[in-house]
Amino acid sequence: MYEYAIYPFDYMRITQSHNDGNHVPHWKNVTNYSDKPWDEASKDSGRQYFIPQNDYVVEQVLIDSRSVRLRTKNNVLIPYKNEPVTLYITLTHMKLETMKRLYVGQLIKKNEKIILEGDEGGAYGNHFHCTANIGTYYGLKYNNNKKWVFCYEKSLLPNEAFYIDPDFTHIMNPKGYDFKEVPIGYRKGDSGTDIEKICNFLSNFVKGNYYGDYCEACVSVYKKQHGIVGDGTTIDSQTLEAMKKDGLKL
């Protein structure tokens, strides 16, 4: 069963979106290289950690720009597409003390606190300058709008790259981004037993074999049977309530 890409900060306080201020020239009216960054300042003006909810591997450490490129160790499910992909993210503005702890090939495990936000590399106040991406990496490029960008095959908005686990991330300011919650059974407090119970329950309503994630496929069929609209693979509150009425016990 594939894992979901979870937003890697315990507090969401996005202070600048991709379409605000000096982030706009990163992508608008660009004829060559682009990315779509956002700034995550976390809980307060102090220094907070990047707290991964998936395992990541360090791809590149760029001391001069105070940046690091990471990729998920495993393929993950992201809101942008319904198939597992390798997700690439970049973080910028860390202090030198943090940069010296990082090296290529380093495994950063789930919940491991290594990367601490900072205010270096042209930053105003402590925060992470972030990008999320999929596909081929073409390099740190200087675009026709005179901005340095992390150029990948496809740059994603934060809500296209990550799901939210409401038991982990406290949302203070999503800056207009509409995030999806990770399905029930995959959250921080959920156990594998819940997944097994849900799959066994759904097998009473759905017959036959399905490709991909069996539980997700069954959820989609169940929701259609019950006239529930929305993301076909997500066990939202309405779906969970319907399941409980049909006899699901967690």
Regions found by a protein language model. Give the residues of each.
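Conserved hydrophobic/aromatic packing and binding residues within compact polymer-binding modules
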Residues: 111-114, 216-223
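Acidic, Ser/Thr/Pro/Gly-enriched interdomain connector segments
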Residues: 169-209
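Extracellular LysM carbohydrate-binding repeats and other cell-envelope/extracellular binding modules
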Residues: 221-250
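Histidine-centered divalent-metal-coordination microenvironment in nucleic-acid enzymes
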Residues: 125-131
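A glycine-rich, coil/turn loop motif that links secondary-structure elements
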Residues: 187-191, 207-217, 231-240
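Beta-rich strand-turn-strand
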Residues: 98-125
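Surface-exposed, glycine-biased beta-strand/turn segments
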Residues: 1-79, 109-110, 119, 123, ...
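Acidic, glycine-rich catalytic/binding loops that coordinate metals and/or anionic ligands
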Residues: 1-13, 41-48, 100-103, 109, ...
